[in-house]
Amino acid sequence: MQIEGILGPIEEQEARIKNPLVLAYIGDSIYDVYVRTALVKKSRQQVNALNQRASGTVNARAQAQAAAILEEEMLTDEEKDILRRGRNAHPGTVAKNMSVADYKRATGLEALVGYLFLSGKYARLEEIMQRVLQEFGV
């Protein structure tokens, strides 16, 4: 995949030193786009049904579960480090309907997704997101 312009990559070192919450900020959107795109491509459902299915995968509990699976199965040491940095970041607030542990793990996964996207590691991002989508039957 080749992406240029505003959506194009930045230097890997620049991506690596970004605040993990900044990586999670962009990673949240990229994760959401992957899930929604997969659902649209595989389904003829109406928007409400698509949104319901997406919400089963795009939430802190599911993302925390995905982070644990990825960490155990396929992440490199560098990717585990980025996930850890995201998990250990202090966001200031946590949504009321989830555990702090799930929220932190989800933030770690979002940071990893953001890092891979910003640094232009699109093939690796695709591998990781394919595994996540497989886990949740998307």
Residue ranges, per PLM feature:
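Double-stranded RNA-binding/processing signature
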Residues: 1-138
